[in-house]
Amino acid sequence: MPGSSDWSFPFEEPLHEVFPALHDAQSSWLSQIDSLSAPDRKTHELIRLVCTVILRNPPGIRRHAQLAREVGAEWEEVLGSIMLTTPAFGMLAAVEAMSHARDGFDAARPPEAD
């Protein structure tokens, strides 16, 4: 059985302990989503960032802001994506997300130069 350091998300270990086949199927499904060729990877991460803002999921916000930067997003693109949630989901969720997004963005490895 994999160790705690083998999990990408905190929910994985307890899920795997109780429902290993479900966890494996979910991991496979998520891997297929990550391998989509369109939209491009930066847009993909910005969309997933917006989804985590809407869900008010700070760990997800940090993760997708980090991944967005690692694939070339600028801070203005991250912040602009967050602000696009305000008409439908309100200002509070966006404002709360900003510090989590900044933490993730700042923790990212710089994008590779072409």
What are the language-model segments listed below?
Residues 79-104:
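C-terminal structural segments of small proteins and small subunits
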Residues 24-29, 45, 59-63, 79:
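A generic alpha-helix surface/boundary motif
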Residues 48-51, 67, 80, 99:
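Hydrophobic side chains within alpha-helical segments
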Residues 44-58:
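Amphipathic, charged-and-aliphatic alpha-helical interface segments
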Residues 55-83:
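Mid-chain, well-packed structural core segment of small domains
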Residues 1-43, 69-70, 96-114:
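Acidic, glycine/proline-rich low-complexity segments that act as flexible tails and inter-domain linkers
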Residues 37, 54-58, 72, 89-92:
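Residues at alpha-helix boundaries and short interhelical turns
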